[in-house]
């Protein structure tokens, strides 16, 4: 059965490109995992799949089994809770990027082929037990979105009672991502209208790149405008989940540049040429993410979404 084992499906949408949908998707997935939830990421940005890169698994390959494709594991579950935190859930992901022969290959497909690929992603991937499947989408309301909505409304249900009685996943709703600027919010309003027309509940709005987090002290400075996402959410009657400043640490994390902090700041120490290479942090991605400034914000987003979805209070 398609999507067998998946409980809840959450779309991550934006009408504007470059607002950080993929980074928001990954951070939501990591935060949900740290709340003890088993999470999957489905990347349907077919012409620009970025999930393999930002999880550091560009060279991973998909395994074909009699049950379908097995998604790539980002990290396994961890049943040993620490400091009173819930046990860590597993995180798996699926992307066209894992199926390309070369990471630099261009995907030049017309609508019917894109539609067929999305249908295959939704029917032929063996996710296993998954509490939340996050779907990272391309910008706009293109062929991918239409195919996704049509297929999900067939395979899943937005009504939790119907989903439970029929043994289907619940299409819990969509998280809308924007930046504060009017040029972004105007396009995201169209995405909200797409949700209304397809009857997909809007779970909330995240205002990404709202300010800049100082990597030294953590203070947030509003270098550009802020608040546009909140105003838009209030006007549309959608829950405003919060703002996310630019986080240099998260950028270093997904670029694979995070190193173990050193206590040595002496000016008269060895020269740069003489200094040994700084030790690389080999902890799993999810554990390194907890050191990022943005983690605390996404932890709250994850808790809000869990409460909202599992209590059945998503707004239509």
UniProtKB/Swiss-Prot annotation:
Record region (Disordered): 260-285
Q: Principal place where this protein is found? A: cytoplasm
GO terms for biological process, alphabetical: iron-sulfur cluster assembly; tRNA wobble uridine modification
List of residues binding [4Fe-4S] cluster: 214, 217
Tell me which cofactor or cofactors this protein depends on: [4Fe-4S] cluster
Keyword Nucleus (UniProt): no
Recorded hits in Pfam families, A to Z, give: ParA (PF10609)
Any idea which positions bind ATP?
15-22
Localization terms from the record: Cytoplasm
Q: Name one GO molecular function term.
A: iron-sulfur cluster binding
The entry's free-text remark on the cofactor is: Binds 4 [4Fe-4S] clusters per heterotetramer. Contains two stable clusters in the N-termini of nbp35 and two labile, bridging clusters between subunits of the nbp35-cfd1 heterotetramer.
- The reply to whether Iron figures as a keyword in the UniProt entry is yes
GO cellular-component terms in the record? Answer: cytosol; cytosolic [4Fe-4S] assembly scaffold complex
Q: Which InterPro entries match?
A: Mrp/NBP35_ATP-bd, NUBP2/Cfd1_eukaryotes, P-loop_NTPase, YlxH/NBP35
- This protein's UniProt keywords: 4Fe-4S, ATP-binding, Cytoplasm, Iron, Iron-sulfur, Metal-binding, Nucleotide-binding
Q: Which HAMAP family does this UniProt record tie to the protein?
A: Mrp_NBP35 (MF_02040), NUBP2 (MF_03039)
**Protein family according to the UniProt entry:** Belongs to the Mrp/NBP35 ATP-binding proteins family. NUBP2/CFD1 subfamily.
Q: What's the stated role of this polypeptide?
A: Component of the cytosolic iron-sulfur (Fe/S) protein assembly (CIA) machinery. Required for maturation of extramitochondrial Fe-S proteins. The nbp35-cfd1 heterotetramer forms a Fe-S scaffold complex, mediating the de novo assembly of an Fe-S cluster and its transfer to target apoproteins.
Summary of subunit composition and partner proteins = Heterotetramer of 2 nbp35 and 2 cfd1 chains.
Q: What protein name applies here?
A: Cytosolic Fe-S cluster assembly factor cfd1
Q: Which species is this UniProt entry from?
A: Aspergillus fumigatus (strain ATCC MYA-4609 / CBS 101355 / FGSC A1100 / Af293)
Q: Which lineage do the record's taxonomy fields give for this organism?
A: Eukaryota, Fungi, Dikarya, Ascomycota, Pezizomycotina
Q: Which gene encodes it?
A: cfd1
């Amino acid at each position: 059965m398609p999507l067998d084992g998946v409980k809840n499906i959450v779309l991550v949408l934006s009408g504007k490109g470059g607002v950080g949908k993929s980074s928001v998707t990954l951070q939501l997935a990591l935060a949900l995992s740290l709340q003890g939830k088993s999470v999957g990421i489905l990347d349907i940005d077919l012409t620009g799949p970025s999930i393999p890169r930002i999880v550091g698994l560009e060279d991973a390959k998909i395994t074909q089994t009699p049950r379908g494709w097995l998604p790539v594991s980002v990290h396994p579950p961890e049943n040993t809770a620490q400091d009173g935190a819930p046990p860590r859930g597993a995180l798996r992901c699926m992307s066209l990027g894992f199926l390309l022969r070369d990471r630099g290959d261009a995907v030049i497909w017309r609508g019917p082929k894109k539609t067929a690929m999305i249908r295959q992603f939704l029917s032929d991937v063996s996710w296993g037990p998954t509490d939340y499947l996050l779907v990272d989408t391309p910008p706009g309301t293109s062929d991918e979105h239409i195919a996704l909505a049509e297929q999900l409304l067939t395979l899943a249900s937005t009504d939790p009672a119907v989903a439970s009685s029929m043994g289907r996943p619940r299409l819990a709703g969509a998280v809308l991502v924007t930046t504060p600027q009017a040029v972004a919010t105007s396009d995201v309003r169209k995405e909200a209208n797409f949700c209304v027309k397809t009857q997909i509940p809007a779970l909330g709005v995240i205002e990404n790149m709202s300010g800049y987090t100082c990597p030294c002290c953590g203070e947030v400075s509003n270098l550009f405008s802020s608040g546009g996402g909140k105003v838009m959410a209030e006007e549309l009657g959608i829950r405003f989940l919060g703002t996310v400043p630019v986080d240099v640490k998260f950028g270093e994390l997904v670029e694979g540049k995070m190193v173990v902090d050193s206590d040595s700041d002496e000016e008269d120490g060895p020269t740069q040429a003489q200094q040994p290479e700084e030790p690389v942090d080999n902890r799993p991605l999810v554990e390194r993410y907890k050191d990022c400034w943005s983690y605390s914000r996404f932890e709250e987003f994850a808790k809000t979404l869990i409460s909202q979805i599992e209590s059945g209070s998503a707004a239509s």
